[in-house]
């Protein structure tokens, strides 16, 4: 009975959550998707008319230089006093 309890504890501890390779695969897929959203491509090296947006796994995400990164402006509201 004690062995069964130890086995079940080990089994449930090991089986919880995704394994490390699954997490890595998911992260790589997310980075490739983000790269495609900015009209880029993950490839071994960028051409002269492209720049590195960020790295997908080990390869750079190459984006054409015409693409501008979005500028985030803070929206501030001021109350007008009369």
UniProtKB/Swiss-Prot annotation:
InterPro entries per record: Beta_defensin_dom
Biological processes annotated in GO: defense response to bacterium; innate immune response
Source domain of life: Eukaryota
Secreted listed as a keyword: yes
Signal sequence extent: 1-16
A Pfam family hit: Defensin_beta_2
Secreted recorded as keyword: yes
UniProt protein name: Beta-defensin 113
């Amino acid at each position: 009975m004690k062995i069964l309890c130890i086995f079940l504890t080990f089994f449930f501890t090991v089986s919880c959550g995704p394994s490390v390779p699954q997490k890595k695969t998911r992260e790589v897929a997310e980075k490739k998707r983000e790269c495609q959203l900015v009209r880029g491509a993950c490839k071994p090296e960028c051409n002269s008319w492209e720049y590195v947006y960020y790295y997908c796994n080990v390869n750079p995400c190459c984006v054409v230089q015409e693409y501008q990164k979005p500028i985030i402006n803070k929206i501030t509201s001021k109350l007008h006093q009369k």
